[in-house]
Amino acid sequence: MASTIAAATKVSRKMFRELHGVVVTSGLIDKTVKVRVGGQKFNKFLQKHFDDPKQYLVHDPNNSLRAGDVVAIMPGFITSKSKRHVVKHIIAPAGTPIEERPPIPSLDELWDAKDAAKAAKKERKVLREKMQAAEEAIELAERMARHAVREIAMREKIISLQKVD
């Protein structure tokens, strides 16, 4: 059952389309570049197509892209509120050659790292919940002990009052 789910997720990961664009800005935000992807929009009134480029913030895991690079990006890799794409590979480098830059990890490596981070987060959450449950149990035991001490003190007081009478 688990292996079929894992296989299905691996297949669904590979179903994303590939977009090609030019790196507009790089180096301003760590592990993030802005990529302009070309496109067209049809104007119904003029019955004509106009250029309508889109700009995306793209996850660059090793800061290996430079402004002017032509890259292939893949949507569907959500890393933050505004980053929804990841670099797949460099098509045409601008400036320094690809060999002199840090390597771009493969998509499988990225997904494995993301899954490992998610598993570690889940493990930390389970440990935190166990810790909170243990602290609550200790607090409850302390409250019960204080209540028992008060109860014993009250009974001793009542007994001492009955002996005086």
UniProtKB/Swiss-Prot annotation:
Q: Does the keyword Transcription apply?
A: no
Q: Name one GO biological process term.
A: translation
Does the record bear Ribosomal protein in its keywords?
Answer: yes
Q: Which InterPro entries does the annotation name? A: NA-bd_OB-fold, Ribosomal_uS17
Residues folding into a coiled coil are: none
Keyword terms of this UniProt record: Mitochondrion, Ribonucleoprotein, Ribosomal protein
Instruction: Tell me a Gene Ontology molecular-function term this record carries.
Output: structural constituent of ribosome
Quaternary assembly: Component of the mitochondrial small ribosomal subunit (mt-SSU). Mature N.crassa 74S mitochondrial ribosomes consist of a small (37S) and a large (54S) subunit. The 37S small subunit contains a 16S ribosomal RNA (16S mt-rRNA) and 32 different proteins. The 54S large subunit contains a 23S rRNA (23S mt-rRNA) and 42 different proteins. uS17m interacts with the F(1)-ATPase inhibitor IF(1) dimer.
Would you identify the family this protein belongs to, as annotated? Belongs to the universal ribosomal protein uS17 family.
Q: What name appears for this protein in its UniProt entry?
A: Small ribosomal subunit protein uS17m
